[in-house]
């Protein structure tokens, strides 16, 4: 777009700054797992990001392994039972896809029957990230930085 609008130098500088932020935030593999879950709408069941798509890359750059990495699909319908089987060390909970706040997303997730049996939940290892953190935008870079900071042990 920088070429189209004759702002290449500004666009290139902004892209370089984002690249530097990603490089600065990127962390080596931690050996920890995570499930990045979300609700697509107020009526839809729990969903998760699979191994395809930007969310999987953000988890990997944060040094985490997605418990749904084997699925090449980017978007999955999941159940609490599936989470219990996969035992993620961290829960990354996306919010805001349909206008819900972080607090509303957390309350909805914690109200799911059986979720209290997840070790990540009982240990308080839930990271809330805005919906934009899983899409190609500068918000994804901020989401990576927030995720790395929140999952530092």
Could you say what each language-model-derived stretch is?
Residues 51-75, 95:
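His/Asp/Glu-enriched short active-site or ligand-binding loop at hydrolase and phosphoryl-transfer sites
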Residues 28-30, 84-86, 119-122:
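Extracellular/periplasmic catalytic domains that process cell-envelope and extracellular macromolecules
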Residues 79-93:
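Proline-aspartate-enriched helix->loop->beta-strand connector
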Residues 39-45, 73-75, 96-100, 132-135:
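Solvent-exposed loop/turn segments at secondary-structure junctions
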Residues 9-62:
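Basic- and aromatic-lined ligand-binding clefts that recognize polyanionic substrates
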Residues 3-6, 90-153:
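Structured C-terminal subdomain patch of bacterial secreted/periplasmic proteins
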Residues 1-13, 42-49, 69, 130-137:
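Second-shell loop/turn segments in exported
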Residues 2, 12-15, 19-22, 52-59, ...:
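Extracytoplasmic/secreted envelope proteins and their assembly/folding machinery
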């Amino acid at each position: 777009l920088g070429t189209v609008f004759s702002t290449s130098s500004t666009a290139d500088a902004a892209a370089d700054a984002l690249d530097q932020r990603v490089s600065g935030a990127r962390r080596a593999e931690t050996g920890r797992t995570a499930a990045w879950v979300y609700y697509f709408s107020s009526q839809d069941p729990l969903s998760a990001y699979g191994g395809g798509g930007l969310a999987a890359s953000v988890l990997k750059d944060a040094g985490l392994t997605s418990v749904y990495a084997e699925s090449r699909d980017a978007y999955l319908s999941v159940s609490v039972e599936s989470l219990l089987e996969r035992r993620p060390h961290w829960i990354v909970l996306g919010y805001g896809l349909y206008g819900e706040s972080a607090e509303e997303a957390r309350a909805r997730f914690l109200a799911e029957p059986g979720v209290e049996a997840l070790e990540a939940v009982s240990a308080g290892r839930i990271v809330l990230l805005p919906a934009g953190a899983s899409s190609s935008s500068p918000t994804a870079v901020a989401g990576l930085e927030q995720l790395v900071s929140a999952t530092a042990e």
